[in-house]
Amino acid sequence: MVNDQLHIIMPVKDSIAIAERAIHAIVDCGYTLCVYDDNSLPENAQRLDEIANDKHIQVVHISSLTDHPSPNYRLVLQQSQQQALIENKHLLIVESDVIIKANTLNRMLEEVQEGVGMVAAVTVDEQGEYNFPYHYLHRLRYRFLSKKTIDTKKRFSFCCTLLTNELL
């Protein structure tokens, strides 16, 4: 079942092998996403188009929107915000090297409530170690084992972040 509460985006520039794994991790969970190709090499842009043959994947080539050289993260965020508002959905940003687990996005959606602007997933590497900027969590790990939500004033990464429609 494709979720209708999220407009999911993934900015990509080359690194197609890991990006393809990240894309399929989202689609395999029943979600659709929009991949923003930020001026990848021609063969990589072509591979993204081949991947987009799946009806749950749309590829937007930034070169069709601007001639500004990469990175174009601001433009991607502006376009995505506008689309999420049109669709009345939350905006979810997933970086192209983040392989989500099956329940991650549903768990993030469960945290959306009035007054919450952002919900971020703490990402880990393949060995289960916290990724930067979450290194400080290893010292506090025992405190978080029983909590679904961690209120933090520390920095967080946009590696896998949901921006609520209310915030947009």
Label each PLM-derived region with a short phrase.
Residues 122, 134-154, 158:
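Short, flexible, basic/aromatic active-site loop/helix in glycosyltransferases
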Residues 157-168:
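Conserved nucleotide-sugar donor-binding
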